[in-house]
């Protein structure tokens, strides 16, 4: 036999003649009148062939011809003349009558084969599928005749195997039952159940049917990452482990001792070594492959845009690799998506979402500790806290603070998550808190994620001086948890009085509360304090003690453990506010006669406008301003251009860390005796730095030296213990009386502005402190730079800045858009509209290339980029693998990190470029030249920050009021100029 096959031409001729002369249709009845019928019942998968094919430039019968092409040839493949004579008699059908087809044709190794796709009864007519077929790719060996001998030998072996199997079954023909080559009709969708049934019928192909030279029956030993070809599976396995960091020996073979790092390699090994060959049919044509890689390459070459990611286990194809990975969880019995409430796991995320929609108890479990809003997953809570922490205290803040009052030593430190978990599991929780959380694990997770760990705050805070009061200690450099803000201004120290060093020793709750009072809480006006000099210290103490007996102590401090430090103290150190718009200033001028009538009415009108950022007024039965000394009542005066509006609560963190030191002494609210001890130079400097003081004592204008703060607020935005009349809590009166003499005798230091070097500002901003960059915009760093700019000329402060109503409304708009189906709250209406589509199922964004539709436009764009355009812009630097989405690349890089190789993360996701843009903005800001006119801007100029729809900062100039204030204080400012136009430019260079 070896000598016979040495002569290639002779062997080829003999084999071809043998195949040609053999009767191929012994089980078929070929009628002269037309038509081919089955003589005996035919099983599904019975094959007929091989029938020789020839190349031609123009086919004789287009119905039997196949389009063929190669690198240098484009033509047709058609059966030879001796075969085509009877093949023409087989009736063919197309789309209209495709259901009648029980026979299909295909080309294997250059030969034509026919195969039944269903059970055919005896006497039934054979009908072939005549729809257009995919072009045949001819390799160079076929064109050159180099492997024609091997193809003929394989075909002969197939015929011998078919004959032997037919003899055993009693047919004695050329048919051979085998696996179904068409698990679904051409162009139809895939059915996994049908495929599994067919695979159970017969999953093995005889060795004679395997032809490794053909693309359809061959196996592609190729790296799917870098597309390198290897001669055997062992070399490919070593390559994947060494070059692409696959886990070694993860998939063992059940029939031998070999192990592989990739499951497709195991499947190929079982097919090659153990003849366990699986079939992967093309959805768009009749081709069937033994290797999913060949099927994928076939789809990309001949069916552009179709799903080209087949599953190695079942053959189902997917449009993306991520969809295939999610599908493979079904075969691996891995259920990565588990419900956090009932611990039920699913293989697909959509099934988990459906489970949560059907079970209300699994939907709302984890609650935000700030606004008490419920979430179903920790991921949703984390996204919510990014928005929630940037705004003011929520409507449920009182409840949270009250719980801390009841258990002042039971809550763990915010920067120690392990202590949080321990305290949650061991300490008894209040009844309200236990009802809010479904499990201790969820509560511990919420407590642990309140704030990231702070390396500089590893010790417990100082013990409180009195029950109900927050601890009072030295200010740390870094901020604490927003839930436990500091009780004094931080970041840079001020004079000793600010740290409590110059005050008297705290021996009573009254003096303790005095330490908590904002230093600008006390009136110190030159024009009005003379009218109140008749009130002595004895009267102050007497009235305060009597009022203390009537009111309980808890009322004064209700909900102030956190708020007294975050809201009341900071508001007391801000400059006096001015109106939000010109219309409000005109209304103030119209209401001046009403305010002059009585001090109570005047205080009520002024305070009602000064606290316009608050939501609701307090009950009317609280004490009025007449019950306490007039020196202590808040009298909000408007000087027509020199006041700053109190910032919204989302800006309070910045003002806590960057206090204006030149206002501190003025905001102490010093009495008349203490004010007289100041030198004339000091008072003139203060008057120059606060333009807008009227020389005549009028009830509607107060000196710029003593801007009064806003009243303290509770968590819900309501006034804690201040009436509409603007009265101060009587506790404040007693506190001032107890400490009045000490304050009067305390030393006063000249105030200076803090000086910050530009490099220090950039370094501080680079470190990523949370109070320097706010989520709604970057107003924090702008205000910081503005404060540094004013240090160059302390006698000429920047013009007043007015905050628009958008920053005020921003505190409440986050509760405005709620879902009527699940109660979820969104900050903007667009977010709510997009969320409602998850309940209604609306998909208003259809794809123009396919029949898919999406509820979100970004998902449609991503679908077009990844599926139809095949864009892969994100590349892994470690293994050169490309991805269509950044999240997929990040997930892929994490796999590298989890293998213990400590690879760095993708540079595209590190945010380096974004931070550099921030630094460029800082440098541009610091290189500007600021004057009062240039900073104030033209009339109506506004500056809007990105990602801040509800909050904006309007820089407007009230020229009339500004010039009026300048003329009022021209006598005191003669040394520095008569008006604001004489101000010199302040240049800040980096």
Swiss-Prot record:
Molecular-function annotations in GO: DNA-binding transcription activator activity, RNA polymerase II-specific; DNA-binding transcription factor activity; histone H3K9 methyltransferase activity; RNA polymerase II cis-regulatory region sequence-specific DNA binding; zinc ion binding
Protein name: Transcription factor hamlet
Function comment: Transcription factor that plays a crucial role in external sensory organ (ESO) that elaborates from a single precursor cell (ESOP cell). Mediates the differentiation of lineage branch that generates the internal 'ES' and 'th' cells (external sensory neuron and thecogen cells, respectively) from the IIIB cell. Its absence leads to re-specification of IIIB daughter cells into external tormagen cells (tr cells), or internal multidendritic neurons (MD cells). One of its role in the development of the ESO lineage is to modulate the activity of Notch and PAX2 signals.
DNA-binding as UniProt keyword: yes
Region described as Disordered: 164-196, 392-440, 554-633, 667-725, 892-913, 933-990
Secreted listed as a keyword: no
Residue spans of biased composition, Low complexity class: 416-427, 683-695, 960-983
Compositional bias annotation for Polar residues: 900-911
Tissue: Expressed in the developing peripheral nervous system (PNS). Expressed in the ventral patch in the cephalic region of the embryo from stage 5, and continues in cephalic region through stage 15. Expressed in the developing PNS from stage 11 to 15, with a transient expression in each PNS cluster. In the ESOP lineage, it is first expressed in the IIIB cell, and in both ES and th cells, although it is only transiently expressed in th cells. In the ESOP lineage in the adult, it is also expressed in the IIIB cell and inherited by its daughter cells, as in the embryo.
Species of the source: Drosophila melanogaster (Fruit fly)
Classification via InterPro entries: SET_dom_sf (IPR046341), Zinc_finger (IPR050331), Znf_C2H2_sf (IPR036236), Znf_C2H2_type (IPR013087)
One CC-aspect GO term: nucleus
Pfam families found in the cross-reference section: zf-C2H2 (PF00096), zf-C2H2_6 (PF13912)
Lineage of origin: Eukaryota, Metazoa, Ecdysozoa, Arthropoda, Hexapoda
Keywords: Developmental protein, Differentiation, DNA-binding, Metal-binding, Notch signaling pathway, Nucleus, Repeat, Transcription, Transcription regulation, Zinc, Zinc-finger
ZnF region ranges: C2H2-type: 221-245, 251-274, 280-303, 309-331, 337-359, 366-388, 817-839, 845-868, 874-896
SMART domains xref list: ZnF_C2H2
Localisation per UniProt entry: Nucleus
